[in-house]
Structure formats: C-alpha cells, structure tokens
Amino acid sequence: MNSNSTLFVRNLAFQTKQDDLTNFFSDVGPIKHAVVVTNPETGENRGYGFVTFSMLEDAQRAAKELKNKKLHGRILRLDFATPRKRSEVDTDQNKAVKKTIRQDNRPRLIIRNLPWSIKKPQHLEPHFSKFGKVREIKIPTKGGGRMCGFAFVWMKDRKAAEEAMNSLNGTEIDGRPIAVDWAVSKDAFEATTLKDASSEEENKEFVSDEGHSIVTEDASADSESEEEVDGHSEGKELAGESEEEGSNVDDVEDSGDSSSDKNSINHEIRDNEGLEDTVFVRNLLFECTEQELYNHFRQFGPLAYAKLVKDPATDRSLGRGFIKFRYEKDCQNCLEMASQLPTQEPTEAEKRFLPSVLVDEGIDTDSVSSRFLLHGRLLKVTSAVTRKEASDINQKSLQERKQKMGKGVDRRHLFLLNEGKIAADHPLFNSLSETDKTLRSQSIAQRKKLLEKNPTLHLSLNRLSIRNISRHIDPKILAMLGRQAIRGFMDDVSKGLRANITEEEENLDKGHRLKRGKSGGVLKQAKVETEKAGAGRSKGFGFMQFISHKYALMALRWLNGREITVKKIIDAEIEWARKHKIPEPQLPNIDYNDRPRRLIVEFAIENIQVVKRRQEKEKSFRQKAKQLKQQEDEDNLKRKRSESDVEDNEAKEKQAKVARIIQRKRMKRRSRKN
C-alpha cells in the first residue's frame, strides 16, 4: 500500500461493509480501493480497515475533515497507514520471549456456558463494551454451524478486561449463568488439563469435619442438558435434573457403618440400584452447604451422604440436592412425612407474580412442615430417580409447560419441510435424474431461506404445491389426479405396500378442517397457475387444497416422485368410471407429445397475512351470498303474496259476478209472478 495516500481506519462498527466504507470516503475524492479487514473464520469484520485515495491531497483532506465523524453510530479513528517494520536482528529466542510476554499481557477473556441465543459477536458485545473498547469477539462453532457454548473476547486494555471479568463472572445472560476467566494458550490449557487429570483420583472424595463422607460434584456433567424448571409442580421439578446430574442420582455404594468406611466411598455409577434409600431435595438456598444439608436431614436417621447439585461451569449450587440414607425405612419415613406437606395451587392473581420461595412466618413449629424448613425455605422432597427416568420426565413436563404457555409449538409447521424430501437411502433416489436431484435440492434450500427471512410465512397443512406438470394439464385434469392420488394411497395401504397415516398425523389439524363441498369430495380446490399475457398458457405448476391434513399427506406421499402423463390420468379416470358404472367424463383428445414427467410435490408456503385476507374475502363473499339469498327469498315471498292477492281478488270478483247474475234471475221471476 502507498502509505502517503492510504488511511488506516479504526473503531468500525461490526456491521460496516466495504461498500459502506467506500461510500463514506468517496465524498472527499476519488478512491482507488477500500478494504474492511475481516475474520477469515467467521467473516465478521475486525473493527478496522484501509482506504487508499488516488490523490495525496484527498487523503490529507479526508484525515482532517472526517476525523471524529460517525459511521454507523461509531466515531472513526483515522491515521496515515505505515508499513509494518520488523527487526531482522531478533533471534529466535528473543522472538519467543516477546511472544510469551505479549500473550501473557494481552487482555483476552474466555466466556463459558453461553446460551445458544448468543450466535454473533453483536449479541455479546453490549455486555462487555460498557467496561471498555472491545477489539474482537470470536464465537467458535462446531460442524454444521452448531454453537460450542463458549467465546473469546479481546478487550483494548487489561484493566477493562479485568473489570469485565470481575463484574460479569457468574452473572446471567438470557437466563444462563456464564463463567468469565482469562484466556490461556492451547499448550498451557492442555498442560493444566493433564495436571488436573493426574490429581483427579486424589481429590475425588473428601471428609467433613464430623468425619462423614461427602461426594464431590461430577465435573464431567454436560451443561448443555440443563433445563429451567418451574417451581409449581412436584413431578415437573424432579425432571429438572435432566442428564446434568445423572451420575449424582445413581447409587453410591455403602459398605457398612464402621468408622473405617466413613473415609471411603465407592463412586461407581449404577443406574438401577440403590435409589430406594435416596431422596431428591429442591428449593434449597443457593448459599446452603452440603454440611448444613447433611446436618438437617440427620433428624430422620443415619445418612450415607448429602450432596448438592452444582453448575459445572460456575461451581455454584443450583438449589437442589440428594440425600442418601443408610436404611431404607428412614428414607421411606422421610418421604411419607414430606407427602403430608400442604400443597396449594396458586390463584389466578398469584400467577401474575413470581411465587414466594419462603414459608409463612406464622407456621407452627411443632407441625410436619417445620421439619422440612431450612434457612427459612420449605424444602420439597421426592424420591430420586435414575438418569433415564429423569430425562423422560423432564422432556414430558417441558412439553406440557410449553404447550400451556403457548411456547415450543411449531405454529409455522416447519416440520413439514421434510415431507417430500427424497433422501439418498430412498428407493426412488436412484431413479431420479441429475436434473431432478438438483431441482429438489435447490427447492429445499430456497424454501428454508424464505421461511428464515420472513416470519409471516408458514407451511400449509392442507395445501400442496405440484410442480413439473405438463402444460396441457388444466384444473379439471389436476383435480382428477388429486382424487386418483387418494384412491391410490388407500389401495397401497390395503395391499400392504405402504404404511397408513398415523393417528397423530390425522389429528394434527383437528378443529381447523374445511367443510366438504357440495359434491362431498375431499378435494377442495385444484388450481393451475397461468401466464397473464397471451392466451393464459400454463406455467407448469399448480396447487391442490384438501379438506384436511390427512388427505393432503396421502396425496403428497403417493404423488411425489411419480412419473405421470396426461394419458395415464385420463385412462385411470375412464377405468374408474366404468368399474363403478358411472357416466364417463368428457375428456380431451391427446394430439400432442405427452412425455412422462416426474412430479415434485411439497406442502405449499403461505403468507399468514394473505391467508387472513383470503379468509376475510371468503367470509365477506359468503355473507353477501347469504344476504342475496335472503333478499331473493323476500322478493319471492312478496311476489307470491302479490300473486295470491290477485288470485283472491279475481275469485272475489267472480263470486260477486255470480251473485249479481243470481240476483237478476230472482228479480225476473218476481216480476213475472206479479
């Protein structure tokens, strides 16, 4: 780079791109090029860049005029770029010493136990920028873009880094406690790990002041399996342990009550043994120690151990623990007394506020509840379960809570993206052409991208997208194909060629199904998209809408990847009509090249706003139709009334005429007699 006409630009915002830098400096004068230095791994910019002007005067003017100007909300720092000078007389030893000193002094922090919501440096920067300037943030990922759960933060100076570490260590980000520490080199980390591994067996157990064996926390617990647990339900909270403390739930073998055994605990993991004498305790004070827990539960009988459940990242208590009794009868007695504790469902008003973890002050000290009071908290005691049972209960209760709260429900039906996908192990995969494989893979990628970008889009439960159809297929023939798909699927099921729709799939849209049409069919609509210009030529794709998800799923699984021709559709329809002795439909003659096409069938992507407008339009149309029908009925009634009135008048006139004739005849008779 030409140092005379090149500016070194610092303090760039993370979202600043090369074009933004070019546009910002081009107002001063012509620019040869502008570069934003990025991280080759993540693609995020490092917060600095270079701008090279065509003229030296423009570079000097830019350094003066744009100094302390803001770009994307950050004040730029401008200097003339100079080549990096390297000393050629440095020996290898001096370089190694300088590198060590530089690494030891650079203010880099490691943040562990990050929540999965922290995916980009911008998400983490606000937490550290209040302590000083953040130079760089790296968030490593695994294969497939999965997060590793930790990150590195490089602060401008060591004082700011130290202040950030002291302030943020142990705090929560998105409900998850983080651990902040100085970052060390990989070699130093591996050396420390080996040293810790060699002394692990020696530190695996220790003895309390009273001689009772206390089991240490298993540091190998997986922090990724933690789940937040609501404190209202017994069964739900028990499941909160998940796999994190799976080894803690297991049996710790007790070889007797001799004094020599108090200093030795066999920490073998046995999933299905020894849980009859173990209880699980919740609602503990975070500051509660294992010794305090041990001393409190000794009132129920001799104990083997008392153990707290700790966060492996911060080594802090999670407010839960395990108590193992020496005798099963003492454990059962404790559980029986715990079952007598008062349980009261919160009122609707109480649900609006956080539940109190403290017991009422007016509690009777002689009651059962007083035996489960520790640090002013009423403990919740239940039976301990194995890791597998805890995981099953946790998953079940988590789903129940999410459904009650309206969370975790796939309202956009994204799981339907996999329907219609022909994987490499599918029987049809080898029969697909390379073009067909490419089209399908591109379609999946495009659909995923659309759904990620626009949250108003969702996958329809009963509407299918049919692509790669012949341009000679009109809505009438497409409707025939839809009906044939349902019949074909049911025939395959009866012959044992394919599995039927499951009960869960059948009830997926329960309460949201469409009404059958006048014909009583399951196909609600068949539509072929046509070009607006010209004679309305088909675009080669269309849509089918069924009355329920069940029939849409049947049609998709039968049609997807199937080769069809217009002749096959027409012949199948004629055969069906003859078999069931119904009039054959009037079908067009095939006088064109009817080559086979393999269908691509997927659940259609719909916009919730468009769907709402369509529903409102249909509702308005139905209301208008109803009003027109009512008006027509009223008009018919009026017409009938008027017609009946005319008929009544005619009848009355006729009767009057007859009466007059009779009266005249009577008058004539009387006149003759006289």
UniProtKB/Swiss-Prot annotation:
Coiled coil: none annotated. Residues 662-674 have a biased composition (Basic residues). One of its GO terms (biological process) is rRNA processing. Its main location: nucleus. GO terms for cellular component: nucleolus; nucleus. The modification Phosphoserine is found at S223, S225, S242, S247. Signal peptide: none annotated. PROSITE patterns: RRM. Residues 194-270, 621-674 are annotated as: Disordered. This is Uncharacterized RNA-binding protein C4F6.14.
